[in-house]
Amino acid sequence: MTVRHWVALDACRKAPNAGAALVLLQRMSADTGLEGLARALRREWPDSAAVSWTLLGNVSGEMLAPWLTQPGEDIWISPDGTARRATLGPLLTPSPLPASQAGLWLVTGGARGVTAACAIELARQSGGTFILAGRSAETPWPTGIRETTDLKTLRGLMASSAVRHGEKPSPAEIDKAARTAIAGLEIRSTLAQIKATGADARYLPMDTSDAGSVTAALAHIRQRYGAISGLVHGAGVLADRLVEEKTEAELRRVFATKAEGLFHILSNIDRAALRHVGLFSSASAFFGNRGQSDYAMANAILANAGRALHAELPGTQVKVFDWGPWEGGMVDATLARHFKEKGVPLIPLGEGARIFAHELLAGDPSDVELIVGTVWSNT
């Protein structure tokens, strides 16, 4: 999957972007996401026409020909030659929560940040047991140093402590130790907040980009806790760079965590036991965003994987959340200013978490893909 999408991106980079007309052709499957690339290209190359055509079966060349003269937009083409635009469901007021939703939940990327807030709210509304999985180690807080989540402050405290003890760590070593300590502190805080709701919570180191790590972690969960009934895939990384500058290594890193990671999990669990699946996608996959061609493709794959799961598991609530930018998420100060200038407000942490939990537990089952946040126009 990753190689296939890199080949497409690399081919686009070699096309003249001034006035170019690019049609990205793909067959509908759970592991394809070229529509994300087309949408990112339209943001980065406004003078070009980049579209994706997704074939919903065996479509002949004769059936495709008439669409070459149509206005450029992303479409799904059926074997009879008819086409429709890619659409998603509206965010509606969900129905009341069922009486009990307790089960065994696996949450990737769920011990820190935005996904942690969603996991806490989900625990509050559902109960059950939560296994939070992430790459960070649950490192104990260093002895003799006061707790703080401010990285700059902690680096200073650690440097002063090292001097008192006659140690001479490098700035890079201090930074790494500080980040590791804060990660451990945040993990323990999330576990405590989930337990405060009455649910149970455990942390398990697991790197979704590493198939071996996922296999071992899920075997442990299966042996100790049983079958997973709820999956929340929130793990993800960014490597923002314009298409012309994008490297294969960056794309691989983004795909490994977000897209490949999901399939590593799905191939190691009993999918028939799933009752809820919540996938953290991004509005950049639906609207495109400058510098995020790889991230848009990886998240578009999540949307298609969600549709495939919805078809495979008709009794399972499957939701793909195309999130806009969050307060306290991966949006730094510079990017926050960019969105503000474009009229795209950040999603408040508490409000976003409540939307997530209520939609996943009680939203309309027919609405698989949802945009949460303001519609992007010219971002």
Go through each PLM region and give its residues.
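Glycine/proline-rich active-site loop of Rossmann-fold NAD(P)-dependent oxidoreductases
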Residues: L68-G72, L361-D367
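The conserved SAM/SAH-binding core of class I Rossmann-like methyltransferase domains
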Residues: L25, W53, A133, L204, ...
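C-terminal low-complexity, glycine/proline- and small-hydrophobic-enriched intrinsically disordered tails
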Residues: A21-L22, G134, H358
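Structured, non-catalytic alpha/beta "coupling" segments that mediate domain-domain communication
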Residues: W76, D364-T379
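NAD(P)H/NAD(P)+-dependent Rossmann-fold oxidoreductase cores
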Residues: M1-R13, N17, G57, G61-S281, ...
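Flexible, glycine-rich beta-alpha linker
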Residues: A30-G36, A40-L64, A137-T143, A239-D240, ...
